[in-house]
Amino acid sequence: MASKLLNIALAVFAIVLPAVAMATEFTVGDDQGIFGVDEKSMLEILVKWQPEHLSTFRNETSSIFLKDERFPFEKCEEILLKFLKREFKRFKDAVVQWTMHPWERDARMARKALKRGRQAYGLLIELACTRSSDELLGARRAYQSLYSESIEEDVASQVDGIERQLLVALVSSYRYDGSKTNDRAIKLDTQKLEKSISIGDKKQLIKDEEIVRILTTRSKIHLMAVIKCYQETFNKNIIEDLDEESSLKDTIYCLCDPPQYFSKILDSATKANANKNEKEALTRVIVTRANVDMKDIAEEYDRQYKTPLAQKIEDVALGNYKDFLVTLVQRALPKGSD
């Protein structure tokens, strides 16, 4: 049974779906990639797909992706996921993450972060703060479907440090996503933040109820206005008033300036001394942001580090994996850009 499922799973990557209207076909030969699939041709097709193409792919490949019985997403068969991750190991999960439903992808990453403990709490912050309210809700639903538990209860029971209150509130949040703000509320929140920061222990601010309330319930556009008001009122950036290693910093960057946050993560991921968590972020960031804000991230990376992001990936990655990531970056940029 397992062998049959594996053959189905791998064969599907050698199919050009009519609904996607891709003309290129995969070829098979002794010198080609895994199980005879022409990896280069496969990646050339996959990297062109927009979200609607990926959705069609999942819907048309019921041998791999099953419609969830409760929620509107397609999830990967567990046994097939293990096989695919093994067979596509050289791509460092890029192909698997790219084809997976975003809700499932985020849910599985959250689960992995919880298993790794404190060193991966930043990933939980990233998932909770850089997604829209509906995307985060979708990930929470997928988490329930995949693991028969809620992400909220797992964070509450498995995080035992001072980050627990903040992380539970972040993953539980459903923020207002509209464009309206209230000037009075902005000023009040600015004053409350400054008061909490000025009288509190910097290393304990993450437990401050007012700070946690504001950062986990207010809309992103409201928080951007609060950060601006803080700067104008007190003549300093709120980031300067926080502990250097504080999770609150990552929370604020993820909520208010994702391109700057992701640029920093990518810089860490491409350093020679990067640890496992940092290295994995290269795949994660490029794949999850390719259809969101990759143009902004690439421009911010270039501004901060004086090197085009695509060139940096060329320098540190290899083979088809490198080509896949570079193409995802370049397709988001204006023609003629590096």
Can you say where each PLM-predicted feature lies in the sequence?
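Structural signature for extended repeat/solenoid scaffolds and their inter-repeat hinge/linker regions
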Residues: 2-9, 13-338
